[in-house]
Amino acid sequence: MNPADLEQLMARAKEAQARMAELQRELALRRVEGSAGGGMVKVVATGELRILQIEIEPSLLAAGDRAMLQDLTAAAVNAALANAQKLVQEELQRASANLAVPNLADLFGAGERS
């Protein structure tokens, strides 16, 4: 490998590193929502896969069905996290396309799962 190629490779690596740090900051600010029970339970998550908020319809609490509340909450959390993972995957694919490097989503384990 000639020195110019190595220099270019290092420059791309630095650019990719800077873009990933920027993307991480952006994802921390992005919000996605998941819901269950026709919107009776809503969950807000970040692009960092952190749960920020859970909203439960008062009528669901008044019903007193603990098992249903637990199921709907779990479903809404899972939906929010799935939406956050999709957001991360899309942003990583976009970043890797802009940098002309292999799919970064696969490198970070956020690629599609079977």
Where are the regions a protein language model picked out?
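Stable alpha-helical structural segments in soluble proteins, enriched in small hydrophobic residues
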Residues: 72, 76-87
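Long amphipathic alpha-helical segments used for membrane anchoring, targeting, substrate engagement
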Residues: 1-28, 33, 83-114
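N-terminal intrinsically disordered, cationic/polar leader segments
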Residues: 29, 35-54
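Residue-level signature of catalytic and energy-coupling elements of molecular machines
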Residues: 13, 49, 73
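A broad detector of the eukaryotic-type serine/threonine protein kinase catalytic domain
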Residues: 6, 56, 77-78
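A short interface-forming secondary-structure element
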Residues: 50-69
